[in-house]
Amino acid sequence: MPNLQGNRTLTEWLTLLLGVIVLLVGLFFVIGGADLAMLGGSTYYVLCGILLVASGVFMLMGRTLGAFLYLGALAYTWVWSFWEVGFSPIDLLPRAFGPTILGILVALTIPVLRRMESRRTLRGAV
């Protein structure tokens, strides 16, 4: 059980770990996506990577904004996937499966992030 002294629960540590994972995936997307965009490829990876980096940072700060940024990036991913390949399930799978699984995990962290935010507010932090 969390307290006002700042001790973290297991769910908070797991949420922070997920924030690190999202941040690292975002950095990979930004760096690899920039190379791809310079070669004339899709700018999706750069834009999505920026959203994921911001999401990971906010999750590490214990802010629900991080989860909602990720869910926005996931919606963007689905729109881009349909635009790229249409409604072909076999072609959608590699583009949307991994981000959707990660999105489910991120959505499950929203109550934990809210608790972290409220505790920080009680301590007087902004």
From Swiss-Prot:
Function: Catalyzes the oxidation of glycerol to glycerone. Also acts, more slowly, on a number of other polyols including D-sorbitol, D-arabinitol, D-mannitol, meso-erythritol, adonitol and propylene glycol.
Reactions listed under catalytic activity: glycerol + A = dihydroxyacetone + AH2
Name of the featured protein: Glycerol dehydrogenase small subunit
Transferase found in the keyword field: no
Localization (cell): Cell membrane
Keywords recorded for this protein, A-Z: Cell membrane, Membrane, Oxidoreductase, Transmembrane, Transmembrane helix
GO cellular component: plasma membrane
